[in-house]
Amino acid sequence: MTDRYAGRLTILEDQEIDELYGLPRFTPDERVHFFAPSLEERDAADRHHTLANRVLFILQAGYFKAKKMFFSFEFDEVREDVWHVLRQHYPPHHDDGLRAPILKQTRHAQQRKILTLYGYRACDAAERASLVEKAEQTARISAKPIYLFQILV
């Protein structure tokens, strides 16, 4: 864990944090499964004008299907996943055009589209209040941080 968190309470070990919140590391079979877009997902991906944005959309959708989270990454960090998407979905292309940094606004726009595709929406004030109430009730049973974390996650 980094020094900036040295004074904080430790609930999970670094490996546990990575397992829960880290970028997925897929096997070849998992790549086939998670990067196989539905017709609707493929249509949404293909609406992007550049190959880079199409590949980014399929990657983000696949990672979201796996972990129900979004991640910040560059193509060179997920090279094997990029190659898989190119081979499976855009075979005449190669990764030469995928060198530029991914724009934040593009990433966020795609994430909003993915959330809509899967029927997710933002948490409203009533739902946040319900979570706070559940946390308060849970703390009455046990104030152990790991217990609270497990119940609320």
Residue ranges and their predicted role:
Residues 2-153:
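Long amphipathic alpha-helical coiled-coil/heptad-repeat bundle
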